[in-house]
A protein has these predicted regions:
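Active-site-proximal helix-loop-helix substrate-binding element of RNase H-like nuclease domains
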Residues: 27-29, 34, 38-59, 64-184, ...
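Short, conserved, GDST-rich strand-edge loop motifs in beta-rich repeat architectures
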Residues: 17-19
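Conserved "right-hand" nucleotidyltransferase catalytic core of DNA-directed polymerases
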Residues: 1-7, 11-13, 24, 31-33, ...
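Cytochrome P450 core scaffold surrounding the K-helix E-X-X-R motif
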Residues: 10-14, 43-46
Length: 364
């Protein structure tokens, strides 16, 4: 069975990922399009299903979906799996799924449905007008006088666009089927499919986070930046020492240090020759430009209700075939140079927001 769905959620999937996307209270599946055994594509308008005593297409879809013997195909199957699992409150075992996107990436094709269609010169191409339809129906809209102050567009607000949205979902299934047929001469080995299944279980399980550590790290970062800004203003007398233009002028005119820019490598190089206030200011500049806390912000954005963050890895995400990081980029964590004992104490101090004690321990 080939599947494509259209959904709505007030959570921004580009910021929070598919798993938290489905946790929004207003998350729902709007349209399901599917084909069984290469047959005609059926489209289910989910806004009407609850109002009908029996919906033949929907019942047929559920029978196939819940049958472990039926292989389910989708382009970026993780999204369909995650959304359908939430909708039915039932697990969607990855062992039953095939990801056409991953299988395309395995043979050097792009990771987007429309790009793959273009490269393969398929007769059926993804409808490029779909992005506008997604913006209209799948994400909140800005309240205006013209739209009556509403924050969401429903089918009744534009029936013509809604029918176009249904047709767009059908077209996506057509393209996905055409891609699967086109790449069938490059079969996926059993072991590679098993690796993808493992990957899905890893992403589904996620990683447990410490909410108090994230909060403490963000508070510490804010406090540290405020203190550094205070020091910078005192040293330079500038209204905004964060401004590259102001700081470069101060370094040149008042300190005699003609530095071309404030990029990290440049600052590190000029620190070797700087003295006095100029040296202190460059040291502060390096501290102020640190971005490690952004990972904590991303963790917060992606954290699910059970305080786990999911969907952190993309199978075959790189052209070489290796995994690629998504969201938090766990494979790229900052390296530390303190002992395990100091690290454990530091974590506890950050959780408790005892920053003066942390400063004594690590001189931060």
């Amino acid at each position: 069975m080939n599947i494509d769905i259209e959904t709505y959620s007030s959570n921004d999937i580009s910021k929070c990922g598919a798993y938290k996307y489905t946790e929004a209270e207003d998350f729902e599946i709007l349209i399901i399009a599917y084909s069984i055994d290469g047959g005609a594509i059926s489209a289910i308008d989910m806004t009407k299903v609850d109002n009908e005593p029996f919906h033949a297409d929907y019942e047929t879809f559920k029978i196939a979906l819940f049958d472990p013997a039926v292989k389910k195909y989708a382009f970026n199957a993780n999204f369909e799996r995650t959304c359908l699992a939430k909708h039915f409150n039932k697990q969607m075992p990855p062992e039953e799924w095939i990801c056409t996107m991953v299988n395309s990436m395995r043979i050097g094709l792009p990771a987007s449905l429309d790009k793959v269609g273009e490269v393969l010169r398929l007769q059926s191409q993804k409808d490029k007008a779909g992005k506008n339809l997604i913006r209209y129906f799948s994400i909140p809209c800005k309240p205006t006088k013209v739209n009556g102050g509403r924050t969401r567009n429903l089918p009744e607000h534009d029936f013509e666009k809604w029918q176009q949205f249904i047709d767009y979902c059908i077209r996506d299934v057509e393209v996905e089927m055409a891609i699967a047929n086109k790449i069938k001469d490059f079969p996926v080995t059993a072991i590679e499919q098993t690796y993808w299944v493992f990957d899905q279980h890893i992403n589904d399980r996620g990683i447990k986070l410490s909410k108090s550590l994230m909060l403490g790290a963000n508070v510490l970062d804010k406090q540290s930046k405020e203190e550094l800004l205070k020091q910078a203003k005192h040293i330079t007398g500038l209204e905004n020492p964060n401004s590259p233009t102001q700081l470069l002028a101060w370094l040149k005119d008042e300190q005699g240090l003609d530095i071309p820019n404030l990029q990290k490598k440049t600052v590190q190089e000029y620190l070797k020759e700087a003295t006095g206030k100029a040296k202190k200011m460059l040291e502060i500049r390096l501290q102020m430009s640190k971005t490690s806390v952004k990972k904590y912000n991303k963790m917060h954005d992606m954290m699910c209700s059970d305080e786990r963050v999911r969907g952190l890895f993309q199978f075959y995400g790189a052209g070489t075939g290796r995994w690629a990081g998504r969201g938090v980029q766990l494979q790229n964590l900052t390296k530390h140079y303190i002992s395990d004992t100091e690290l454990e104490i530091a974590r506890d101090l950050i959780k408790e927001q005892r920053f003066d004690d942390l400063d004594l321990l690590l001189n931060v």
